[in-house]
């Protein structure tokens, strides 16, 4: 008799706890989804700007430079340009 009472008690406790548990659904609320999308767009914008700034410095295409000739631009010191010139000047060994 005591074991059946204990089983009934545990069953009722489980049922009571089952009603108290709330399932959590990510992005169930539209505001959460909107904030997440805005955050992703912000991160994408920042990363894109960093990549563009890096490429602008590395490539140094001089598209915006005025009143300079190609000869003037080539004569300016540029570590990347000198490295590329050194690579081009190396003799390749044909095997």
UniProtKB/Swiss-Prot annotation:
<feature type="transmembrane region" description="Helical">
    <location>
        <begin position="35"/>
        <end position="55"/>
    </location>
</feature>
<dbReference type="Pfam" id="PF15831">
    <property type="entry name" value="SMIM5_18_22"/>
</dbReference>
<keyword id="KW-0472">Membrane</keyword>
<dbReference type="InterPro" id="IPR053081">
    <property type="entry name" value="SIM_Modulators"/>
</dbReference>
<dbReference type="InterPro" id="IPR031671">
    <property type="entry name" value="SMIM5/18/22"/>
</dbReference>
<dbReference type="GO" id="GO:0016020">
    <property type="term" value="C:membrane"/>
</dbReference>
<keyword id="KW-1133">Transmembrane helix</keyword>
<protein>
    <recommendedName>
        <fullName>Small integral membrane protein 18</fullName>
    </recommendedName>
</protein>
<keyword id="KW-0812">Transmembrane</keyword>
């Amino acid at each position: 008799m005591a074991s059946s009472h204990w089983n009934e008690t545990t069953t009722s406790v489980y049922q009571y706890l089952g009603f108290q548990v709330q399932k959590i659904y990510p992005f169930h609320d539209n505001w959460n989804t909107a904030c997440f999308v805005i955050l992703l767009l912000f991160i994408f914008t920042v990363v894109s700007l960093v990549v563009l700034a890096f490429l602008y410095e590395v490539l140094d295409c001089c598209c915006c430079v005025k009143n300079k000739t190609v000869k003037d631009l080539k004569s300016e010191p540029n570590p990347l340009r000198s490295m590329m010139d050194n690579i081009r000047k190396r003799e390749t060994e044909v095997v």
